[in-house]
Amino acid sequence: MFRFLCTLVVMIASLAGSIRAAAGAAEDVCWPLALETRYLTGNFMESRGGRFHTAIDLKTEERTGIPVLAVRDGWISRIKTAPDGYGKALYLTDEGGWTYVYAHLERLADAPRERIHARQRSTGRYRCDLHLGAGDLPVRQGEVIALSGRTGTDGPHLHFEVRDQAGMPVNPLLHGFAVQDTIAPEILAVRVWW
């Protein structure tokens, strides 16, 4: 029963956050991948082994090296590299304080790549987490900021998050990143855990 209530609370909180985000979010965004197709391989708030997925995973046609685009004008506010988790990741923050997270990248654009390589050389470690100021690495909407990859994960895809001004994840599908879905869901079973 406790588990059921916790799950219910999380679902309601995420829905409320998504509705709040959609009400205050700008819709003038571009798709984060330079692809004609828009398919998901993972959805927002899917259960993932004891946690919820706070992003959408975008299909890259089983390839790496697809140009990844800045969805809004803003700046690269954070660069992370790790052999696991997000792998190579960029955080783009816009003027309104919204943050867009791109993870599992193969290669970063020149400016962020030079910044993270300098940090890696100075620390002697591959795993780095570099926070940047508003004027450090500005980007324009539609600019190529990276290439898609599979770092930190098994299969190639783009893990894409939208976070509000408080840093809370919101549903990207309600924030201008919708995909056309013409297949109605079919409920095959319902399971309740106690």
Where are these regions (language model features)?
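Positively charged n-region of N-terminal signal peptides that target proteins for export
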Residues: 1-4
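Bacterial N-terminal signal peptides
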Residues: 6-16
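Short, charged/polar, Gly/Pro-enriched secondary-structure boundary elements
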Residues: 12, 167-170
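Surface-exposed, glycine-biased beta-strand/turn segments
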Residues: 19-89, 93-96, 125-135, 140-143, ...
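A short linear boundary/processing microfeature
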Residues: 46, 107-108, 164, 178
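Short beta-strand-turn/beta-hairpin segments enriched in glycine/proline and small hydrophobics
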Residues: 54, 90-126
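A cross-domain feature marking catalytic cores of carbohydrate-active enzymes
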Residues: 104, 162, 189
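A short hydrophobic beta-strand segment most commonly corresponding to one strand
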Residues: 159-167
